[in-house]
Protein backbone atom coordinates (compact mmCIF):
# COMPACT_ATOMS: atom_id res chain seq x y z
CA UNK A 1 0.00 0.00 0.00
CA UNK A 2 1.38 3.41 -0.98
CA UNK A 3 1.54 6.05 1.74
CA UNK A 4 -0.53 9.13 1.08
CA UNK A 5 1.51 12.30 0.50
CA UNK A 6 1.89 14.52 3.54
CA UNK A 7 -0.48 17.47 3.22
CA UNK A 8 -0.06 18.85 6.76
CA UNK A 9 3.35 20.19 7.69
CA UNK A 10 5.49 23.15 8.56
CA UNK A 11 8.81 23.89 6.89
CA UNK A 12 11.46 26.25 8.18
CA UNK A 13 13.87 28.31 6.12
CA UNK A 14 16.73 30.67 6.91
CA UNK A 15 18.45 33.51 5.09
CA UNK A 16 22.20 32.92 4.91
CA UNK A 17 23.08 36.58 4.38
CA UNK A 18 20.40 38.21 6.57
CA UNK A 19 19.52 37.92 10.26
CA UNK A 20 16.11 36.43 9.64
CA UNK A 21 14.32 33.11 9.54
CA UNK A 22 10.97 31.99 8.25
CA UNK A 23 8.45 29.19 8.31
CA UNK A 24 5.66 28.01 6.02
CA UNK A 25 2.69 25.87 6.99
CA UNK A 26 0.25 23.86 4.91
CA UNK A 27 -2.87 22.20 6.36
CA UNK A 28 -5.37 20.08 4.45
CA UNK A 29 -6.35 16.86 6.23
CA UNK A 30 -6.37 18.33 9.74
CA UNK A 31 -8.27 21.39 8.44
CA UNK A 32 -10.83 19.11 6.79
CA UNK A 33 -11.19 17.14 10.05
CA UNK A 34 -11.99 20.32 11.98
CA UNK A 35 -14.49 21.54 9.39
CA UNK A 36 -16.19 18.13 9.19
CA UNK A 37 -17.31 18.35 12.83
CA UNK A 38 -19.70 21.31 12.35
CA UNK A 39 -21.47 22.99 9.37
CA UNK A 40 -19.38 26.16 9.49
CA UNK A 41 -20.32 29.07 7.20
CA UNK A 42 -17.55 29.89 4.72
CA UNK A 43 -16.26 33.04 6.51
CA UNK A 44 -16.03 31.10 9.79
CA UNK A 45 -14.27 28.19 8.07
CA UNK A 46 -11.73 30.64 6.67
CA UNK A 47 -11.07 32.19 10.09
CA UNK A 48 -10.64 28.75 11.65
CA UNK A 49 -8.15 27.81 8.96
CA UNK A 50 -6.15 30.98 9.44
CA UNK A 51 -6.10 30.46 13.21
CA UNK A 52 -4.96 26.85 12.72
CA UNK A 53 -2.15 28.05 10.47
CA UNK A 54 -1.11 30.66 13.04
CA UNK A 55 -1.06 28.09 15.86
CA UNK A 56 1.09 25.74 13.79
CA UNK A 57 3.58 28.51 13.05
CA UNK A 58 3.69 29.68 16.67
CA UNK A 59 4.42 26.19 17.98
CA UNK A 60 7.41 26.16 15.65
CA UNK A 61 8.84 29.31 17.27
CA UNK A 62 8.57 27.97 20.84
CA UNK A 63 10.76 25.51 22.70
CA UNK A 64 8.44 23.82 25.18
CA UNK A 65 6.58 20.61 25.96
CA UNK A 66 2.88 21.20 26.39
CA UNK A 67 -0.01 22.95 24.73
CA UNK A 68 -0.49 26.21 22.84
CA UNK A 69 -4.04 27.57 23.03
CA UNK A 70 -5.37 30.36 20.81
CA UNK A 71 -8.75 31.67 21.88
CA UNK A 72 -10.53 34.61 20.27
CA UNK A 73 -13.67 36.04 21.88
CA UNK A 74 -15.95 38.79 20.63
CA UNK A 75 -19.36 40.45 20.82
CA UNK A 76 -20.05 39.63 17.17
CA UNK A 77 -21.77 36.69 15.44
CA UNK A 78 -18.64 34.60 16.07
CA UNK A 79 -18.33 34.87 19.86
CA UNK A 80 -15.54 32.30 20.09
CA UNK A 81 -12.78 30.69 18.04
CA UNK A 82 -10.40 28.22 19.67
CA UNK A 83 -7.40 26.26 18.44
CA UNK A 84 -5.18 23.95 20.48
CA UNK A 85 -1.83 22.75 19.13
CA UNK A 86 0.53 20.58 21.16
CA UNK A 87 4.31 20.44 21.11
CA UNK A 88 3.79 16.98 19.55
CA UNK A 89 2.21 18.90 16.66
CA UNK A 90 -1.33 17.62 17.18
CA UNK A 91 -4.04 20.18 16.48
CA UNK A 92 -7.79 20.60 16.99
CA UNK A 93 -10.20 23.54 16.82
CA UNK A 94 -13.75 24.81 17.00
CA UNK A 95 -15.89 27.92 16.65
CA UNK A 96 -19.19 29.14 18.04
CA UNK A 97 -21.27 31.20 15.66
CA UNK A 98 -24.70 32.60 14.79
CA UNK A 99 -25.17 31.45 11.19
CA UNK A 100 -28.14 33.72 10.42
CA UNK A 101 -26.05 36.81 11.25
CA UNK A 102 -23.11 35.99 8.99
CA UNK A 103 -22.91 37.44 5.48
CA UNK A 104 -20.92 35.53 2.82
CA UNK A 105 -18.46 38.42 2.48
CA UNK A 106 -18.15 39.15 6.22
CA UNK A 107 -14.81 40.55 7.37
CA UNK A 108 -12.97 39.95 10.64
CA UNK A 109 -14.47 43.09 12.17
CA UNK A 110 -17.95 42.02 11.03
CA UNK A 111 -17.57 38.58 12.58
CA UNK A 112 -15.70 39.44 15.76
CA UNK A 113 -16.64 42.96 16.85
CA UNK A 114 -14.80 44.20 19.95
CA UNK A 115 -12.80 40.99 19.93
CA UNK A 116 -9.72 39.96 21.88
CA UNK A 117 -7.23 37.18 21.21
CA UNK A 118 -5.63 35.24 24.06
CA UNK A 119 -2.43 33.32 23.33
CA UNK A 120 -1.76 30.81 26.10
CA UNK A 121 1.26 28.55 26.57
CA UNK A 122 0.45 25.70 28.95
CA UNK A 123 3.68 23.74 29.55
CA UNK A 124 3.74 20.21 30.90
CA UNK A 125 6.05 21.51 33.63
CA UNK A 126 6.25 25.08 34.83
CA UNK A 127 3.94 28.04 34.86
CA UNK A 128 1.25 28.86 32.32
CA UNK A 129 1.79 32.08 30.35
CA UNK A 130 -0.86 34.15 28.59
CA UNK A 131 -0.72 37.19 26.34
CA UNK A 132 -3.75 39.13 25.09
CA UNK A 133 -4.18 41.41 22.08
CA UNK A 134 -7.20 43.24 20.66
CA UNK A 135 -8.59 41.94 17.37
CA UNK A 136 -8.34 45.41 15.87
CA UNK A 137 -6.48 44.56 12.67
CA UNK A 138 -8.13 44.14 9.29
CA UNK A 139 -7.08 40.48 9.24
CA UNK A 140 -5.88 37.82 11.67
CA UNK A 141 -2.44 38.22 10.10
CA UNK A 142 -2.41 41.85 11.23
CA UNK A 143 -3.56 40.89 14.74
CA UNK A 144 -0.76 38.36 15.24
CA UNK A 145 1.81 40.77 13.87
CA UNK A 146 0.51 43.45 16.27
CA UNK A 147 0.79 41.01 19.17
CA UNK A 148 4.49 40.51 18.54
CA UNK A 149 5.06 44.24 18.08
CA UNK A 150 3.54 44.91 21.51
CA UNK A 151 4.85 41.93 23.45
CA UNK A 152 8.32 41.17 22.11
CA UNK A 153 11.41 42.96 20.90
CA UNK A 154 11.97 40.66 17.93
CA UNK A 155 10.39 41.62 14.62
CA UNK A 156 7.78 39.09 13.47
CA UNK A 157 5.24 39.18 10.64
CA UNK A 158 2.46 36.79 9.60
CA UNK A 159 0.63 36.10 6.35
CA UNK A 160 -2.35 33.75 6.76
CA UNK A 161 -4.94 32.48 4.28
CA UNK A 162 -7.56 29.72 4.09
CA UNK A 163 -10.27 28.85 1.58
CA UNK A 164 -12.22 25.99 3.18
CA UNK A 165 -9.98 23.34 1.62
CA UNK A 166 -6.49 24.43 2.49
CA UNK A 167 -4.99 26.65 5.18
CA UNK A 168 -1.57 28.21 4.59
CA UNK A 169 0.66 30.56 6.48
CA UNK A 170 4.00 32.32 6.23
CA UNK A 171 5.98 33.70 9.15
CA UNK A 172 9.11 35.86 9.04
CA UNK A 173 11.11 36.60 12.18
CA UNK A 174 14.22 38.63 12.86
CA UNK A 175 17.21 36.93 14.48
CA UNK A 176 19.79 38.50 16.81
CA UNK A 177 22.44 40.60 15.06
CA UNK A 178 25.07 38.31 13.58
CA UNK A 179 25.53 38.70 9.85
CA UNK A 180 24.56 42.39 9.82
CA UNK A 181 25.82 44.49 12.74
CA UNK A 182 24.83 47.99 11.63
CA UNK A 183 21.37 48.94 12.96
CA UNK A 184 20.35 50.88 9.85
CA UNK A 185 21.40 48.03 7.57
CA UNK A 186 19.48 45.57 9.75
CA UNK A 187 16.37 47.73 9.52
CA UNK A 188 16.69 48.03 5.75
CA UNK A 189 17.25 44.29 5.37
CA UNK A 190 14.16 43.47 7.44
CA UNK A 191 12.03 45.96 5.54
CA UNK A 192 13.13 44.47 2.23
CA UNK A 193 12.35 40.89 3.27
CA UNK A 194 8.92 41.75 4.64
CA UNK A 195 8.09 43.99 1.66
CA UNK A 196 8.85 41.13 -0.71
CA UNK A 197 6.68 38.77 1.34
CA UNK A 198 3.92 41.35 1.18
CA UNK A 199 3.76 40.94 -2.61
CA UNK A 200 2.58 37.34 -2.20
CA UNK A 201 -1.10 37.04 -3.12
CA UNK A 202 -3.60 34.82 -1.30
CA UNK A 203 -3.93 32.73 -4.47
CA UNK A 204 -0.17 32.17 -4.59
CA UNK A 205 0.12 31.30 -0.91
CA UNK A 206 -2.76 28.82 -1.18
CA UNK A 207 -1.79 27.34 -4.53
CA UNK A 208 2.01 27.20 -4.81
CA UNK A 209 4.42 24.77 -3.17
CA UNK A 210 6.99 26.07 -0.71
CA UNK A 211 9.97 25.94 -3.06
CA UNK A 212 8.08 27.95 -5.67
CA UNK A 213 6.92 30.51 -3.11
CA UNK A 214 10.46 31.08 -1.85
CA UNK A 215 11.84 31.33 -5.39
CA UNK A 216 9.05 33.74 -6.32
CA UNK A 217 9.86 35.99 -3.34
CA UNK A 218 13.57 35.55 -2.69
CA UNK A 219 15.31 34.34 -5.85
CA UNK A 220 17.97 37.02 -5.29
CA UNK A 221 18.59 35.93 -1.68
CA UNK A 222 20.50 32.95 -0.29
CA UNK A 223 17.77 30.83 1.32
CA UNK A 224 18.07 27.39 2.92
CA UNK A 225 14.89 25.32 3.20
CA UNK A 226 14.80 22.60 5.87
CA UNK A 227 12.88 19.34 6.09
CA UNK A 228 9.12 19.26 6.57
CA UNK A 229 7.68 18.60 10.03
CA UNK A 230 4.32 16.85 10.01
CA UNK A 231 1.17 17.90 11.86
CA UNK A 232 -2.08 16.00 12.37
CA UNK A 233 -5.55 16.42 13.79
CA UNK A 234 -6.04 14.73 17.14
CA UNK A 235 -8.61 15.28 19.86
CA UNK A 236 -7.47 14.71 23.43
CA UNK A 237 -10.96 13.95 24.74
CA UNK A 238 -11.52 10.55 26.36
CA UNK A 239 -14.01 8.64 28.46
CA UNK A 240 -11.61 8.91 31.38
CA UNK A 241 -11.52 12.72 31.18
CA UNK A 242 -15.30 12.85 30.98
CA UNK A 243 -15.52 10.58 34.01
CA UNK A 244 -13.16 12.87 35.93
CA UNK A 245 -15.47 15.79 35.13
CA UNK A 246 -18.35 13.87 36.69
CA UNK A 247 -16.33 13.05 39.79
CA UNK A 248 -15.58 16.75 40.23
CA UNK A 249 -19.33 17.39 40.59
CA UNK A 250 -19.65 15.16 43.64
CA UNK A 251 -21.69 11.98 44.10
CA UNK A 252 -25.05 13.60 44.88
CA UNK A 253 -24.99 16.00 41.93
CA UNK A 254 -23.84 13.26 39.55
CA UNK A 255 -26.64 10.95 40.69
CA UNK A 256 -29.18 13.76 40.31
CA UNK A 257 -27.99 14.39 36.75
CA UNK A 258 -28.54 10.73 35.89
CA UNK A 259 -32.12 10.97 37.10
CA UNK A 260 -32.76 14.34 35.41
CA UNK A 261 -31.54 13.00 32.07
CA UNK A 262 -33.62 9.84 32.05
CA UNK A 263 -31.01 7.40 33.26
CA UNK A 264 -27.98 8.50 31.22
CA UNK A 265 -25.63 11.47 31.41
CA UNK A 266 -24.33 12.44 27.98
CA UNK A 267 -21.07 14.38 27.76
CA UNK A 268 -20.25 15.72 24.30
CA UNK A 269 -16.82 16.83 23.12
CA UNK A 270 -17.28 20.17 21.37
CA UNK A 271 -14.10 19.65 19.32
CA UNK A 272 -14.81 16.27 17.72
CA UNK A 273 -18.47 15.50 18.56
CA UNK A 274 -17.56 12.30 20.39
CA UNK A 275 -20.30 11.43 22.90
CA UNK A 276 -19.75 9.65 26.20
CA UNK A 277 -22.71 8.13 28.08
CA UNK A 278 -22.73 7.33 31.80
CA UNK A 279 -25.58 5.51 33.54
CA UNK A 280 -26.28 5.02 37.25
CA UNK A 281 -24.02 1.96 37.42
CA UNK A 282 -21.15 3.91 35.85
CA UNK A 283 -21.56 6.73 38.38
CA UNK A 284 -21.64 4.30 41.29
CA UNK A 285 -18.50 2.61 39.98
CA UNK A 286 -16.72 5.95 39.64
CA UNK A 287 -17.40 7.05 43.19
CA UNK A 288 -16.53 3.62 44.54
CA UNK A 289 -13.04 4.32 43.24
CA UNK A 290 -13.10 1.61 40.58
CA UNK A 291 -12.93 3.97 37.61
CA UNK A 292 -14.44 3.25 34.20
CA UNK A 293 -12.82 0.31 32.44
CA UNK A 294 -15.35 -0.14 29.65
CA UNK A 295 -18.08 2.18 28.41
CA UNK A 296 -21.70 1.28 28.83
CA UNK A 297 -22.21 3.12 25.52
CA UNK A 298 -19.95 5.39 23.48
CA UNK A 299 -20.87 6.62 20.02
CA UNK A 300 -20.07 9.33 17.46
Curated annotation (Swiss-Prot):
One of its GO terms (biological process) is protein refolding. It is found in: Cytoplasm. One of its GO terms (cellular component) is cytoplasm. One of its GO terms (molecular function) is protein folding chaperone. The keyword Zinc applies. Pfam families: HSP33. Disulfide bonds join 235-237, 269-272. InterPro entries: Heat_shock_Hsp33, Heat_shock_Hsp33_C, Heat_shock_Hsp33_N, Hsp33_helix_hairpin_bin_dom_sf. Under oxidizing conditions two disulfide bonds are formed involving the reactive cysteines. Under reducing conditions zinc is bound to the reactive cysteines and the protein is inactive. Keywords: Chaperone, Cytoplasm, Disulfide bond, Redox-active center, Zinc. Belongs to the HSP33 family. Redox regulated molecular chaperone. Protects both thermally unfolding and oxidatively damaged proteins from irreversible aggregation. Plays an important role in the bacterial defense system toward oxidative stress. This is 33 kDa chaperonin. The gene is hslO.
Amino acid sequence: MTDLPDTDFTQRFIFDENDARGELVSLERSYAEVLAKHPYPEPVAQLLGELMAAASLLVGTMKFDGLLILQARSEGPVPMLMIECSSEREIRGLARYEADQIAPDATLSDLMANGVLAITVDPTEGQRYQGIVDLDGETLSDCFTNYFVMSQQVGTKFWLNADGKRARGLLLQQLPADRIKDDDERTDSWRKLTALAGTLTAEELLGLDNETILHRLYHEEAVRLFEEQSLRFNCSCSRERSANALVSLGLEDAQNLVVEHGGNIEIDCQFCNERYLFDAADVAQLFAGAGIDSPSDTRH
